[in-house]
Amino acid sequence: AEFPSQVQYLLIGGGTASYAAMRAIKKRDVTAKILIISEDSYPPYMRPPLSKELWYSDDEEAAKKLQFKSWNGKWRDVYFEKPDYYCAPSDLPAKSEGGVAVANNTRVVSLNPTDNIATLKDGTEIKYDKCLIATGGQPKNLPVFRKASAEIQKKVSTYRTASDFTELNNITDGVKSITVIGGGFMGSELACALGHKGQKVGFEVNQIFPENGNMGNVLPEYLTKWTTSKVKSEGVNVITDTVVNNVTMQDGRLKLQLRTGQEILTDHVVVAVGLGIDTSLAESGGLETDERFGGYRVNAELQARSNIWVAGDASCFFDAKLGRRRVEHHDHAVVSGRLAGENMAGGQKSYYHQSMFWSDLGPDVGYEAIGIIDSALPTVGVFAKATEKDTPKAAEGAGLRDDGAENPAENTEKQPTTTTTTASSEEFGKGVVFYLRQQKVVGVLLWNVFGRMPIARKMIRDQQAYDDYTEVAKLFKIHSEELD
């Protein structure tokens, strides 16, 4: 591709944060010329459906086109814009009204912040006025698979991109067994999604992870147990408290030897054990990275140094309420991308709006959360019985989630946790869990309670300590039968 020698706005990375920044720049600077450099083969798209809705479609052809039915029944595709929204990079200089170009399948390999120059992998140099780094990261693999033979590696994949979805979707059409490694958000959502398809098509799904239950690092133990039983009910063989020690080939299949001595024969393995953050521009760009949280260190305005901002997964930012953080979630990519874009176009806003995140295990159980959600923190939970209206399906129908077209979790020091719950039943139909640090609420998790995020956001902003959480929970109206 031919590139302009100079661009006004250079956005490195083609994901949600980059897209949100582009929208924010265009809002403030109507004739902006913006170049997005993406390693992906597709124009910017949203990732959440890749582990959620795309798997629940009965229409195979639609899934191949990355189209899906929202939980509320409406059809759409994963792309933020139609293809003709973007122009070719070489056409950008001539766009007197402004324009947005995307260069796919390439990457920036070095930055020269003194002269404001970015160099692409083919040696092309592009001078920029303002630059955003929103490179996210690459999914981690495990040494046991990384060091395996080429024959084994053919049957092992990681999961992050639309291409990964297409590949895995094709694989699942011809296997008897598939195994997911990892018990966090991605691993658990994917296991449920594959379980759903497996029950229809006829393959078994295993899920293996070291924690004592699904989402064990984020949910209090009683919710972890409940979630694990929910995942099992989706047809998943959940194997907790263990890891894969060794992998060999047996009759064309993978034989996984677990630490517990158990052996599992499977046709394909998907590794979902988190993200390795891409900070490859740190050295050439003279950018500081964060040893504790990973990612590039930026200030509260998401700026790393003059003319360089960082948003999304790779941004380790300063949050005036909760301290230094790094967050890997869709809504954070939207919020931080938007903020960085506004500031690149002359704004002076600091990080204030707490991003939220959600995780749906199919259309019937889901949660939304905000702030610091970590099972090592003391928690207080208040629960009530759920009704039909308390599902992701109903929430989406009410239009309560920001898909990012317009408009996360992290670790803190491990410490003993105290869990109280005022749920009389083991059902945990719907409820709210408060995560505390020094007695103050730093995180709120809404379990099958939707549309109450503004209340939770205000609580974190206020940083108060409360005496009676049952009273506080009433603010979320978990006992009322219908949404107001």
Predicted regions and their residues:
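Rossmann-like dinucleotide-binding cores of NAD(P)H-dependent redox enzymes
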Residues: 177, 185-248, 353-359, 366
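N-terminal Rossmann-like FAD-binding beta1-loop-alpha1 element of flavoenzymes
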Residues: 6-30, 186-198
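Residue-level detector of alpha-helix initiation sites
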Residues: 15-19, 41, 137-139, 163, ...
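Mid-to-C-terminal Rossmann-like scaffold of FAD/NAD(P)H-dependent oxidoreductases
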Residues: 1-7, 314-452
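FAD-binding core/adjacent interface of flavoenzyme oxidoreductases
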Residues: 1-12, 24, 81-179, 257-259, ...
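N-terminal Rossmann-like dinucleotide/flavin-binding domain of flavoprotein oxidoreductases
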Residues: 24-125, 219-237
